[in-house]
Amino acid sequence: MKSNISINTNSHFPYLGNGIEFTENLFGLEFNAELIQKTSGLIWQPNSTLPYSTLKRLPAPYNILTDIALEMTVHNKGKKGLIGHNSLLNEVKSIDGSLMDKFILEVQNHIDNPTRESAELIANVRCWSSWLANGIKIEPIFNGQKKACAFIPWPLSGLLLLSSRITGQQPEFEYAADYVLRSGVLPDEELDNCDDLNKNVDYIRSIKPLVAFHDFDGNEQGFRMTHLAMERTSNMMIENALLCLNNDDIKENLEKIELATKQSNQLFNAMWKVSEPLLYN
């Protein structure tokens, strides 16, 4: 629960820890807006929409989250996954409640001494938990029912809520952060340009999703990884926009923004080659 909320807009646009202040009390822990902003800054690259690192398998004892999530995909590399068998919810119910106690201690250590390593662990717990929670939600739909599941069992619900609050994210499934930005592995090599549609398609197909609901190499992979490929242009857009605001070589920087926007659109147009357009009607 938030308390001591204040917003100050004097002389600058407010953000967490600098104009937007509050205290968060949750599961016996206390942290503030400044700590949330610092945690976020340890996870996400500056002047970009990309994280410092992609999602990683969790270490013990949190590896149970990774293990279940990697088995949930409906079309799971030649076999039917947990969602396809309508058994994901039951698997998640088997997670021991003591995992939440361990995570609370982990977060307390981060509050006392926030590091990139501790922030990354929290971010990874959040991402895997979010995938599992949303997998539970949509599991009935995949199995012919008309209503989604509205129940997230403990301790998954607690892990998701605490990890979301301290990273400044919503507990609800985040399209950008969860579905795309942190759950795909970009190749080391970047495209020199995006003028060749076939090369764009090959590049998108080379991006490997780490977790999925429906498939790892079909329509879902194509849709998600197209958007991840597009995000590689974000740094050029943001940095040159900031330079324009500082009246620094405006013409040159506007041309770079135009190029980044063009490349983003060229990659987006490849999506219809890697996923079925009728799915989006």
Predicted feature residues:
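Hydrophobic faces of stable alpha-helices that mediate helix-helix packing
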Residues: 227, 231-241
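Short, charged/polar, low-complexity loop and linker segments
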Residues: 206-224, 239-247
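Feature marking long nucleic-acid-engaging regions of large polymerase/nuclease enzymes
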Residues: 163, 178, 191, 213, ...
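Internal amphipathic alpha-helices that form coiled-coils
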Residues: 241-269
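Intrinsically disordered, low-complexity acidic/proline-rich regions
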Residues: 1-124
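Extended amphipathic alpha-helical segments with heptad-repeat/coiled-coil character used for oligomerization
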Residues: 5, 13, 258-281
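Non-transmembrane, amphipathic alpha-helical segments
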Residues: 117, 144, 218, 222-229, ...
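Long, charged all-alpha helical bundle/coiled-coil segments in cytosolic proteins
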Residues: 104-207
